């Protein structure tokens, strides 16, 4: 399907979630396949984190394991050739080299029920409007260190926005990474 879409002139990006049983060699093989064989425009990656509604709780990554896995992945010889769809500082955060707080409102999710609170993974209710989501959600209650359900989270929906803000504020810092 990806090759067909590319043949038809579509830009293709793939999203993948990495879980506990994956090792850096397998991840590198997948990224090489996406970049070299499929020639996708980019890969969006995120660590699998044990949010409570997930049906399989035993294959998720802890923060410690996430950092080690991404350090090992980015140490691979081909790492600089892979096309990721995320900021370099977010990728550096995944490897444990940046300390960020979650920005749960940075990637709001909406479905037929409304705007999800506080993020699509926790889904602790819905707001009827974006204004209601922003003004009636107590954002300080969420994020790693503030809420036990967020303890191991390093997911893009909360941390990419923080990394992008850091990139805008410190562009030279972002250029130093990778």
Show where each model-derived region lies.
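Flexible mid-to-C-terminal extensions adjoining Fe-S/redox cofactors in radical SAM and related proteins
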Residues: 115-178
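Radical SAM enzyme [4Fe-4S]-AdoMet core and its adjacent flexible, acidic
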Residues: 1-107, 112, 117, 121, ...
């Amino acid at each position: 399907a990806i090759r067909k879409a590319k043949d038809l002139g579509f830009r293709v990006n793939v999203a993948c979630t990495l879980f506990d049983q994956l090792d850096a060699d397998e991840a590198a093989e997948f990224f090489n396949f996406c970049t070299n064989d499929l020639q996708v425009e980019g890969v969006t990656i995120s660590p699998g984190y044990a949010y409570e509604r997930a049906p399989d709780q035993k294959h998720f990554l802890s923060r410690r394991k996430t950092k080690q896995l991404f350090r090992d992945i980015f140490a691979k010889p081909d790492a600089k050739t892979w096309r990721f769809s995320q900021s370099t500082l977010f990728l550096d955060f995944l490897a444990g080299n940046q300390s960020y707080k979650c920005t749960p409102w940075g990637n709001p999710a909406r479905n037929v029920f409304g705007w999800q609170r506080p993020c699509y993974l926790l889904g602790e209710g819905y707001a009827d409007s974006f204004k209601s989501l922003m003004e009636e959600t107590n954002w300080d209650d969420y994020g790693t260190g503030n809420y036990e359900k967020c303890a191991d989270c390093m997911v893009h929906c909360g941390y990419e926005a923080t990394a992008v803000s850091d990139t805008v504020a410190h562009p030279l810092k972002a250029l130093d990474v990778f």
